[in-house]
Swiss-Prot record:
Region (Disordered): 107-126
Source organism superkingdom: Eukaryota
Ranges where the PPM-type phosphatase domain occurs: 47-337
Name under which the protein is recorded: Probable protein phosphatase 2C 65
Alphabetized UniProt keyword annotations: Hydrolase, Magnesium, Manganese, Metal-binding, Protein phosphatase
Length: 382
């Protein structure tokens, strides 16, 4: 969830009457839009496997969505997972989950109607132009939705917010956008096994350039004595809210102090060896490594239950690894990139993504590596 202490006060995607006790083995939830897209909030298809499970901390604050035929194109798909935090985190994550893809979808449709067709030749320049255009659309709507949360939202987002990690796939092009500490990891074939390629950087206060931005805006970054490895963002004159991420929707108590809503956006061309992308909230990544996640998904004979198997594995690991802790919510979307059979077993090795084009708008340069604690930051002894 990502917040230490909090102040409480579109269309909402509901995931069940108990507001969070669901998992991916339930009945599929699918609806059609008026312009050809198929929106999935639970279940599986030939392209995706989805699963969500409430943790032990209270109401489920995770949300997820998949849009097939995105923008009216049969070979185009949009996937996203969202991890809310704070008293209204469950409302904000679902609000963003519904509104972000719907606005991007409508923008693409309207651009096509106006004659601004997608560039379809294979030249490097034209594909980069497509990426830059889509990056602008994403950043615009990230900022627009965040601004609306602060101005006229029915939800108090002063100390509540959400992460977001999304993947847009068109033909052999992946555009990934990341905000916060949810993560996207690619499973790619290597002989008779898989290797895990981390596509996103966890945007946390311990990433040096993130910390530098926060400190330059008078925010504070430090770890509490009881959690020496978890750096958090604090207001200048108050030990609140203790946010464990450096970018998010909402959390307006920190927006003047270095917290931003500009996503990391980059593009990767899909190779013949690339099999699937796993999008998941930190309830998965806190207990399972990238390699373990890719191995679980790659070993599933029935792709439709891959996300469910991963969520169940994480739940068991929470119980064994952290028996005294409350398990976090988990949301997983597995996007399959092709329909060829692939290996079931074998060792998994870690690799770093090769980015085709990266965002001009992000100030984070620490792609692919586990972030180190920023120089000059210390624990808070209290």
């Amino acid at each position: 969830m990502g917040v230490c202490c909090s102040k409480g006060t579109g269309i909402i995607v509901e995931h069940g009457a108990d507001d969070g006790n669901e998992c991916g083995d339930g009945e599929a939830e699918v609806r059609d839009t008026n312009d050809g897209a198929v929106v999935r909030t639970r279940g599986s298809s030939k392209h995706v496997s989805m699963s969500i499970k409430q943790g032990k901390k209270g109401i489920n604050q995770d949300a997820m969505t998949v849009w097939e035929n995105f923008g009216g194109e049969e070979d185009t798909i949009f996937c996203g997972v969202f991890d809310g935090h704070g008293p209204m985190g469950h409302k904000i994550s679902r609000h963003v989950c519904e509104n972000l893809p719907s606005r991007v979808h409508s923008k693409i449709r309207s651009s096509k109607s106006a004659g601004d067709e997608n560039i379809e030749n294979n030249s490097s320049q034209s594909q980069e132009e497509l990426f830059r255009e889509f990056e602008d659309i994403l950043v615009t709507f990230f900022k627009q939705i965040d601004s609306e949360l602060g101005l006229d939202s029915p939800y108090d987002s002063f100390c509540s917010g959400t992460t977001a990690v999304t993947v847009f796939k068109q033909a052999d092009c992946l555009v990934i956008a990341n905000l916060g500490h949810s993560r996207a990891v690619l499973g790619t074939r290597s002989k008779n096994s898989f290797k895990a390629v981390q596509l996103t950087v966890d945007l946390k206060p311990c990433v040096q350039r993130e910390a530098e931005r926060i400190v330059s805006c008078k925010g504070r970054v430090f770890a509490m004595e009881e959690e020496p490895d978890v750096y958090r963002v604090w207001m200048p004159d108050d030990d609140c809210p203790g946010l464990a991420m450096s970018r998010a929707f909402g959390d307006f108590c920190l927006k003047d102090y270095g917290l931003v809503c500009i996503p990391d956006v980059f593009c990767r061309k899909v190779s013949r060896e690339d099999e699937f992308v796993v999008l998941a909230t930190d309830g998965i990544w806190d207990v399972l490594s990238n390699e373990e996640v890719v191995k679980v998904v790659g070993s599933c004979k029935d792709r439709s239950v891959a996300a469910e198997m991963l969520v169940q594995r994480a739940a068991r690991t929470w119980r064994t690894k952290f028996p005294a802790s409350k398990a976090d919510d988990c949301a997983v979307v597995v996007l399959y990139l092709n329909h060829r059979p692939y290996p079931r077993e074998g060792n998994v090795s870690r690799a770093i993504s090769t980015i085709s084009w990266r965002s001009n708008k992000s100030n984070n340069e620490c792609y692919g590596a586990a972030p180190l604690s920023p120089l000059g930051l210390s624990q808070r002894v209290s």
